[in-house]
């Protein structure tokens, strides 16, 4: 693992990497705990190379905050990163990032003569921004600088800092920074207390009392799952539980939209319950996402594992949309042919995709999705021999894959779907309620494929099929965009000795009751 402390060293490292390798980036302030490590492990799983930054950012600390006593554990952090599979740690000094020594003084951190990134005031004046003016300007300034230096494909931030996550996502959209921002679930101690570098300021008794934050949020979540959506009802539930620990001093309790941070009167689709309080002198934050959408079932696995058949039948049985990702690639292939665009010209492909309005709808009378492109139904047209022969080359284009991942995520906003592919649970729907990794041995998949081809009148060699399937697995697992990987929280189902009905039964048992 490389230890880099200068911008020049970081740039040299990035230039030494193959351009086709994906880069994951986890920005931290060090003093790593299990929450950081879970994000780092996710980045290592998702990318070819992972870079972690360790930088205690002076610009995000206000006067009389804990900048000077914030724990610095660099050697320990580097060892944890190395153990987790990190490829490089970037640990610059404030001066290296253009923060003068004078600007590191308590009274002058935010008045240095440097460019400052200012996120939308409506996002920074609420929640933590009320008591920490200027904090998110400091965060946004350094995060922007780090993203420009590292130039990652994906950057990972914890959901515990939900306001920061929303602001960074907005910043990346507004400034057109070419990076995917990945939110990582909050990691908790056995008591429910969210991991935080500031937990070490707490005594054991204070930690126990602080666990009321999560209990109070869970109490509101229980009401939400029972159908309560009104702001007052949900906040009252939190306050009732908080009242059991009188030593806790509440700073704020809010129900907001998780993307815009606008306060909500009630939850229609999703809401963020956010809380900040002090236990002793230590300030703690926590939150829970309340999601009213119908469930998403993400089924991944290698080619030939039976995903398509199972996914269609699961969708029909549960009355959910079958998100036919294969049909989406076919529809894009049809559209490019209609536009007369050569797939050799990726910029022209990108332009054409911006004019492609793709819509899917379940076909209640059959197993297929009905597909429209710009209000023209193409359900049958995309199954033509010409489209079938061209779809593989179109699917290999990074710009097409990225476009369709965004389209698939759009369908996920309302939920109520079953999707199959190779990256549904890792890339497209990382927060799916049910994640399944459906697999089978190469030998079994080759046997199934041989039977299918023989039914169609073809004679095939089993050994050759096994070789082709093994090579397809290798290509799918190593492709630059959306490689085939099992999600950490996916349930693996080995189908070698299972019927379709048995596989479906196993998946249906994973769906939450009442969904």
State each model region's role.
Residues 91, 363, 408-414, 422-431, ...:
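Small-molecule kinase domains that catalyze NTP-dependent phosphoryl transfer to phosphate-bearing small molecules
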């Amino acid at each position: 693992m490389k230890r880099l402390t200068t911008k020049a060293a970081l740039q040299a490292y990035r230039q030494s990497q193959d351009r086709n390798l994906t880069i994951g980036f986890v920005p931290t302030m060090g003093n790593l705990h299990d929450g950081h490590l879970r994000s780092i492990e996710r980045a290592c799983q998702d990318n070819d190379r992972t870079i972690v930054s360790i930088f205690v950012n002076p610009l995000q600390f206000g006067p009389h905050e804990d900048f000077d006593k914030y724990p610095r554990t660099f050697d320990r952090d580097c060892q944890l990163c190395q153990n987790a599979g990190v490829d490089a740690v970037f640990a610059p000094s404030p001066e290296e990032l253009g923060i003068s020594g004078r600007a590191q003084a308590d009274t002058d951190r935010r008045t240095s003569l440097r460019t400052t990134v200012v996120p939308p005031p409506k996002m920074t004046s609420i929640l933590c921004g009320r008591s920490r003016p200027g904090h998110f300007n400091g965060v946004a300034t350094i995060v922007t600088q780090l993203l420009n230096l590292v130039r990652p494909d994906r950057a990972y931030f914890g959901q515990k800092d939900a306001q920061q996550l929303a602001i960074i996502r907005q910043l990346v959209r507004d400034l057109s920074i070419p990076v995917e921002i990945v939110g990582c679930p909050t990691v908790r101690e056995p008591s429910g207390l969210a991991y935080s570098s500031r937990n070490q300021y707490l005594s054991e008794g204070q930690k126990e009392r602080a666990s009321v934050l999560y209990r109070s949020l869970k109490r509101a979540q229980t009401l939400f799952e029972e159908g309560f959506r009104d702001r007052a009802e949900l906040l009252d539930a939190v306050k009732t539980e908080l009242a059991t620990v009188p030593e806790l001093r509440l700073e704020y309790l809010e129900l907001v939209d998780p993307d815009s941070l606008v306060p909500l009167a009630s939850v229609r689709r999703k809401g963020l319950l956010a809380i900040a309080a002090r236990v002793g002198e230590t300030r703690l934050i926590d939150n829970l996402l309340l999601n009213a959408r119908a469930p998403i079932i993400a089924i991944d696995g290698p080619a030939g594992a039976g995903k398509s058949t199972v996914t269609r039948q699961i969708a029909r049985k549960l009355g959910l949309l079958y998100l036919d990702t294969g049909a989406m690639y076919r529809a894009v292939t049809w559209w490019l042919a209609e536009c007369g665009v050569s797939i050799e010209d990726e910029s022209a492909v990108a332009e054409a995709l911006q004019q492609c309005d793709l819509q899917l709808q379940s076909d209640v009378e059959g197993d297929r999705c009905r597909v429209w492109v710009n209000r023209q139904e193409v359900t049958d047209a995309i199954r033509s021999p010409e489209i079938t022969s061209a779809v593989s080359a179109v699917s290999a284009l990074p710009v097409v894959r990225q476009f369709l991942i965004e389209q698939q995520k759009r369908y996920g906003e309302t939920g109520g779907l079953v999707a199959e592919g190779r990256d549904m649970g890792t890339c497209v729907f990382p927060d799916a309620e049910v994640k399944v990794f459906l697999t089978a041995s190469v030998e079994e998949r080759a046997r199934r494929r041989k039977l299918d081809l023989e039914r169609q009148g073809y004679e095939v060699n089993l050994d050759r099929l096994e070789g082709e399937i093994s090579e397809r697995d290798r290509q799918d697992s190593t492709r630059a965009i959306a490689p085939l990987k099992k999600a950490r929280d996916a349930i693996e189902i080995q189908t070698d000795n299972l019927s379709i009905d048995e596989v479906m039964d196993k998946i249906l048992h994973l769906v939450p009751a009442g969904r």
